[in-house]
Amino acid sequence: MKTYPVFQDAGLKVVFYLLQDADNIKKPYREIKEQIGVSLGSVKNVLDELARRGFVCDTKNGRIIKDKKQLLDLWVSNYNEVLKPKLLVGAMAFRTEANRNEWKNIALPKGMSWGGEPAANLTDGYLQPGIFDIYTEIPAAHLIRTGVVKQDANGEIHLYNKFWNWETDNRTVPAILIYADLMGSGNSRCLEAAQRILKNELKDFERKGVLLCYKFYTEWFLLCF
């Protein structure tokens, strides 16, 4: 039986949505489809393959994800290698050093959000950004109209297409994506900041799912005998 490529473009989008909230895995396929913009078949195939790999478990309270941290790690690695490079729109640079130093005062156009290093800084103030990731659902020209950036193929501002449809904080992308951006940088200071995000913002990525599944199947076994 041919396995579905969970960690290619459509699969990565589905897994990203599932990891956002523990209840997302319990939602109807059609609702999941609408939130991420992939086909209904892709949603079903991803969930079937995740179940086959042991990441999705059926309990008396509905489906849950187990081994969330392992699934997160797989998603982060494959997101940075497979999907993120395809999302790149282009690069820009701040017009002046003063603009760069005052980046927090920039009112990003509606439809744009900080990712990576600036998002980490806005989250806990720990990391001073060197590279400025921005995720956008509108043309890059809207950012130029702010008057503080310019086109520069070698610039420190990297624009990526947004790949989800639900509303998020209007300044930063979801914490999982901040974590992924930082982990993908390969920079030691970013890796340290990523661990802070994991510890403080992604506390629920524990092995609770395994315990719930174990409890469910233990109860089922006892009832059968």
Regions found by a protein language model. Give the residues of each.
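Long, well-ordered mid-to-C-terminal structural blocks that present hydrophobic/aromatic surfaces
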Residues: 68-84
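Short alpha-helical segments that sit at the start of domains
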Residues: 1-16
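Long, low-complexity, charge-rich intrinsically disordered regions
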Residues: 80-216, 220-225
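Loop-centered beta-sheet repeat module
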Residues: 15-73
